[in-house]
């Protein structure tokens, strides 16, 4: 009789059997899957020996094509052939419209505000389209490894916000993949280079792919790998190089009218081919719409120089945020196919003052790093090695307080996973509910930050203003996903929410938020000071008004009451002004003139409490 094999759920009954896990680079232009085979971590090839899978999906009436075959049909069937879908992940239709002519698709908006693309198979969401790419990679991996996967580490740009990360996890679930972790692409690149096992130092990861740019500054300390700062641009990459070349070709060819989707696809293919050849050759021949000519590398460099400059500005900002100097950076790692462009490499080298590292294929390095991390998370690390990855959140998280102010709970560039709590209180007497408004951004006023979610805490016991204590806790998990809870400590009533925005940030919005916070820091500080003084003034006026109604006639003379009311009137008159100092001075005057009144009220309360009681009763 055979013995029953018993194991923990999800674990192998054979202790020495490897659990099959992979790393996936879900890219804008190309995607890859990698795994450990025969002691070497490398990308997995398809039946034709190709490791790169173009991130292109074509819908037929009865089937779906993914990869090179779909890419070849892009010009002939543009409406049913979807590329660069990563740019649409976690976005709303309003964001998509800003991309304009770069997206030659027919969009339809659903109730969820997610954009849907009309195809011959019906409307498809970016999540569904991305799932087709992930499904193709899963099937390739299971065929190559000879078994079912226990999970995958999937990489995302460091600047992906909560909505974009959640959309990626949803796509993986549709594709039948268990997500072991979402890993920032620059972090994966550092893992691939084995930087965690090298000497201590500071490393910059410059990641320029097809559609996104990321820069990360990493510190290596005794095997601990920490991301000090991140930056980037969610709408900058090799696709933009293609569009710059395409615009130049149209200008040279004298074409001014709008192109049909198929014509636009063909033009972008010509532009992309020219870009790739210029990484090797100094001059390439280009022909389009009856025009033929030469494109020199010098001209190409001039076309893309503004785009490279955008990436370098993000680099300088990330270095400043990290708290290190440029000359402290000991290595610069290049990631992403667009870093093959000589002008990119020379510009980055000039900024950091050293030759960038390009040892590993920039198209494969992210998938390799993800696969190494997947091995660890799957429990296959036989040597007992553990990799400590400390990613960071890109923008501060907080909530709204009185006066429309943003109170930061978790500052940007805080390592994750993380949990932070802060206590708040009620503003009015008898307040039994509190609205929690969760925000993301760097500015002081909520009008300048991004709203993530709202939820209400009900059942707060009625108390005087300021007596209740509400503890608000923010938790960000290892995938960068946020949950917020609020609990009234006396009664234990609690409410919580997992933040799942219906769409993500618009193009460049994160960069704009950071730039605004730096440029308008003084203005924001003044605005916050004014709002805080206005809140204090309003709170004081309401408290004094309530005290006058309750005890004014009993404890104050007519002259004293008139003096207090005169100071209250002066403070009210200042509420519409912008004079912070004047409001602060008047708050002090009103506080001082009511000190004696407050003392009398306290004495009266104590006397009432002690009336009819003996000293021995009190001592007992």
Swiss-Prot record:
Transmembrane segments: none annotated. GO terms for biological process: iron-sulfur cluster assembly. Gene3D superfamilies: 1.20.1270.10, 3.30.420.40, Actin, Chain A, domain 4, Substrate Binding Domain Of DNAk, Chain A, domain 1. The keyword ATP-binding applies. Disulfide bonds: none annotated. CDD domains: ASKHA_NBD_HSP70_HscA. Keywords: ATP-binding, Chaperone, Nucleotide-binding, Stress response. One of its GO terms (molecular function) is ATP hydrolysis activity. HAMAP family: HscA. PANTHER family: HEAT SHOCK PROTEIN 70KDA. Belongs to the heat shock protein 70 family. Chaperone involved in the maturation of iron-sulfur cluster-containing proteins. Has a low intrinsic ATPase activity which is markedly stimulated by HscB. This is Chaperone protein HscA homolog. It comes from Stutzerimonas stutzeri (strain A1501) (Pseudomonas stutzeri).
